[in-house]
Each structure stands twice: as structure tokens, then as C-alpha cells.
Amino acid sequence: MRTHFCGLVDETLIGQTVTLAGWTDVARNLGGVCFIDLRDHEGIVQVTVEPAEGDANSAEVFKVAASLGYEDVLQVEGVVRARHAVNDKIRTGKVEVIATRITILNKAAPLPFHAHENPGEDTRLKYRYLDLRRPEMQRMQRTRIKLVQALRRHLDARDFQDIETPILTKATPEGARDFLVPARMHPGEFYALPQSPQLFKQILMVAGFDRYYQIARCFRDEALRADRQLEFTQLDMEFAFVRERDVQDFVEDMIRAIFKEVVDVELAAQFPRMTWAEAMRRYGSDKPDLRIALELVDVAELVKTSEFPVFAAAANDADGRVAALRIPGGATLSRKQIDDYAAHAAKYGAKGLAYIKLSESGEVSSPIAKFFGEEAFAALLAHVGAANGDIVFFGAGSYNKVSDFMGALRLKAGKDFGLVAAGWAPLWVTDFPMFEWDEEAQRYVALHHPFTAPAVDDIADLRANARTAVSRGYDMVLNGNEIGGGSIRIHRPDMQSAVFELLGIGAEEARAKFGFLLDALNYGAPPHGGIAFGIDRIAALMAGTESIRDVIPFPKTTGAQDLMTDAPSPIAAEQLAEVHVQVRPKQA
């Protein structure tokens, strides 16, 4: 139906007849001449219709051109010529196509929005097929496509084997809720959609496949936000007979090569490394954005004897923290703006936010200054490096809570004050805690997942020091986003059973839920490790968008709906009966 793509017509084709196909981006009837911007996936070219007196064919072509509306689908035949007025804004701006025939392949109904408009997200998702025609959306989807293609080429060339793992699998406690699928042939029993291929890829290592990868679809029934979806795509990788640095060095080289190939970005020749403890201490986050130079400063030692009870209590608590965040130039913040910062901190668990503001002349404005003597107050300011014109925020409470909300303030301040440096800041975060204590459940939970190996090989040591145990987990962070997470895995069945026990999973439950894994580990499992990268998140970073929904062709809303297909939707009683499911009426 076509000889060339619209966006690739150039001066080399001048004088030649071409056949194009695409959508009417804009049609302008100026009376004696019609201009059509014809668009396909490669771009736009101008089609010109000039009726010649006494020429029935050109008159008919003009009549068709004059009838066109937005997004009508056309086939155009014509001759390429140089444009009198060059348009430098488009790739084809030096040429135009003089139409000798226009065929309307399909008329478009009146549009809910035009390809060059940016309507509300719900409208975009309801008419996703129109949204995806927009040049910006085409660009972002192409970035994702190039990313996946480049990853496959890179891994295929290095002897990785692309192996599929099951989509219908067993429900296992991996953190988020499972999506459950009723098993028609086994009444009362259910499959689960995989939250990750974690256990299958480990079993592939036991089976002797040395290097595995998969572009895997994963499913988690969890609350949505800009960087989360119910279903998502990850690059899943596993290596046999490796230590942490083997995995990290390989994938660091891979990510560096992929960024250069896909978006022509040169990442650092060597990614910096930081332990989890250091990241939390300095940045209040296990995925710090190193483009922001602001750091947290611990001040507990200076406020242990403070008359301010909130500071003193946290400073004298073994699990407490008192941290300061200095914002250069922050003294310009009004009281309302300071209240906005306090409200932002409250979203992350802060019960209050203390501050000291120093005007350019050195005047102090602070609700906590009265609790300090002159010498202690001066020492506090000196310790945090405060200068005239600065504001210093303080957080006090449990270590993790303070780290969370002060880390969130750091990000907000960085953006509000223009302190986010341009460029790319990759980072390895290592030595994560093995466990964290769940106050509500009154038990340990795995910080990564239950299959991550501890740094110690001795089970008795792990049991005795579970609270402070360090794992062999690692994350790759880029500009404050965790783009990949992995670990060396447990390959001994006795260690795996011990970890289950520490997580409150008894022998009987472990056998019922993970018996297949324990059996596999019993038959000569090699030391192994791996990592998984979030394709959606990396594509969003490459494309320069904050929402992964922009790089997913058909995403769900934050309300977990597909507005285009109207999913989820009710199921007929007959279908439910076939899978032995009965839906209870909603509680009033």
C-alpha cells in the first residue's frame, strides 16, 4: 500500500513518485490550495494539493482533500518536490508531496481529543489507541522497545539463556498479595500469578542452567502509585557459581552499555558503592538521589541533655534518632511554607517538625531555641554547618521513622530549591539488613525476600544475632530510583529452613508452601545469585517521564482499572459456577 514512510521522505526523492499511507494530522483548505500534514510512525510530511484548471483529476483530488478531518486514514500518491518555505521543525521540512491521488481508507469519527492535545489521564487511558498516536507517546514507547531489544542482544551475545517460567503457579508468601486464579479441574484450589520468577530461576540453577534471563511479566495485588502497576515487566537474571561482585560487575557493565546504546548517555565508569546503613544515615533512604548534595546530620550526642523533651527522649533511646537537614538559602521560607514542609513530613510519619531559621543578618527564628543555652545552641548550629540565610529542619523519634520523613524532606527541598544537579547518578547499595521487625505482626519479615542469603554461614550465629544480621542483598539505584534489586541466594536447605523459622514460618508450613524448593536445594544446589531490573522504571527514566504509565502501552489507573476495556468487570454466574466460585454480596 506504500512505497515510503511519511517521516522519511527527503531531498533524495525529489522528482520521484511515492505512495504514502497514514493519518491526517492537520488539513488546511486555503481556497486555491490544500495542505495536508500526513503522519505515520516515522513522522510527518506535507502533502500539497493544487488543482489545475481544466484537469478533472486534480479537481477530484482537491475535492477529497477539502473533505478531510482529523485522523482520517489516507493513501496518497504524488511527486516529491522541494518546498519553497522550508520547515526546520520537522525532518521532512525541505520537501513536500504534490498529490496526484488521495484515497480515504477510513474516516475518523469526531475525536475526544486531538493528537497534539494533552487531555486528562482518564481520557487518555479510555482512548489509549488515540493517546498512543501522539508523537510524544510514540517516542516513549519506542524508547521502551529499544531498551528491551538492546537487553536481549546484550545477554544473548554473552551466553545467557532466555527461559520461560510458569504464569500459573503456586501461591507463596512473597510480600504483596497474590492474584489468584481458580483451578476449574481442582475445586476449591487456586493458582497464583507470579510476583516474580524467583523460585523457578533458582531451581533452574539447580537444574544446571548456568546463566538465565527472561523478560518476565509479574503480578502484585498492591496499592498503585506513579511508579507501581498491578502487572509489570522485569528483566530477570540468575547466575550459578557467583559471588556478589560477579553479578554486580556484569550488570553494571550491561546497564552502562544499554544507556549508551538506547539514549546515548555515558554513565559513570565505575558506580559508587554504599552500605544500607550509610545510605540511611546520610540520606534517609535506601535509594538516595545523589544528584542532591544535601545530607542529614545526626545531632543526638548534642541534644541528650536538652530541655526539649522530644529531642532528649529520642537521643537517649537506643533505637532513636535526632537528625538535622540544612537547606542553604532556606531562610526565605515563609511560615506557611514551613507548615507545608511539616505536612509533607507528616505523610511519612512525622509527629512534628522543629526548625531553626537564620536570616541573612543572623537573626534567629525558631520554636526550639528557648530550650538551649547560648553555648549549646551555637554548638548545634556549628555541627550542622548552618550559615546566615539557611534553615535547618530537625526530626526526632525512632531511627527508621526519622530517616523516612527526613529523607522525604531532603527530596522535596532539593526540588523546591533547584538543588537537583543535571545528569545521572548511579549507585550500588549493599549490605542490607537481613530482617526487619514487624510491630503489628510481632515477628521478623525479610527486607528483600526469604531466599536472600545472610552474610554469615553459621546458623547458630544467625539465630543469635537476627536483629542485626546483614544480608547479601544489593540494589542498583539511579537518580533516586531503585532500578534493580538482587542478592546471593540461600543454596543450603538447612540455612533456608533456619531463615523460614526466624520469619515465623514453621517446618510444616515451610513444607506445604516451599517443599519443592527445599527438595531442590537438597539435591546439590550450586551457590547462585541474581538480580531483577524494572523495565518499566528504566524505560521511564530513559524517556524522561515521572510515571511508568507513560511507557506501558496499556496501563491500569491508580484505581486499578483498565478504562479502555472496562476491566475488571462482573463475571456471569455460569462462569463462576464452572470454577466453583461464589461471590458474596458487598457488605452495606
Curated annotation (Swiss-Prot):
A Pfam family in this protein? tRNA_anti-codon
Q: Which SUPFAM superfamilies match?
A: Class II aaRS and biotin synthetases (SSF55681), GAD domain-like (SSF55261), Nucleic acid-binding proteins (SSF50249)
Catalytic reaction list: tRNA(Asp) + L-aspartate + ATP = L-aspartyl-tRNA(Asp) + AMP + diphosphate
Where do the record's region annotations for Aspartate lie?
198-201
The processes (GO biological process) annotated in the record are:
aspartyl-tRNA aminoacylation
State whether keyword Ligase applies: yes
The positions annotated for binding ATP are R220, D221, E222, Q229, E482, G534, I535, D536, R537
Binding residues annotated for L-aspartate, in chain numbering: E174, R220, H448, R489
GO terms (molecular function) for this protein are: aspartate-tRNA ligase activity; ATP binding; nucleic acid binding
**Which Gene3D superfamilies does the record cross-reference, listed alphabetically?**
Bira Bifunctional Protein, Domain 2, GAD-like domain, Nucleic acid-binding proteins
Disulfide links within the chain: none
Do the record's keywords include Cell membrane?
Answer: no
Question: EC number(s) for this protein?
Answer: 6.1.1.12
Where does it live in the cell? Cytoplasm
> According to the UniProt record, what class of enzyme is this?
ligase
One GO cellular component term, please give it: cytoplasm
- Keywords annotated in UniProt: Aminoacyl-tRNA synthetase, ATP-binding, Cytoplasm, Ligase, Nucleotide-binding, Protein biosynthesis
User: What's the domain of life for this entry?
Assistant: Bacteria
Quaternary structure, per UniProt, is:
Homodimer.
Job description of the protein: Catalyzes the attachment of L-aspartate to tRNA(Asp) in a two-step reaction: L-aspartate is first activated by ATP to form Asp-AMP and then transferred to the acceptor end of tRNA(Asp).
User: What family classification does the UniProt entry report for this protein?
Assistant: Belongs to the class-II aminoacyl-tRNA synthetase family. Type 1 subfamily.
What is the protein name stated in its UniProt record?
Answer: Aspartate--tRNA ligase
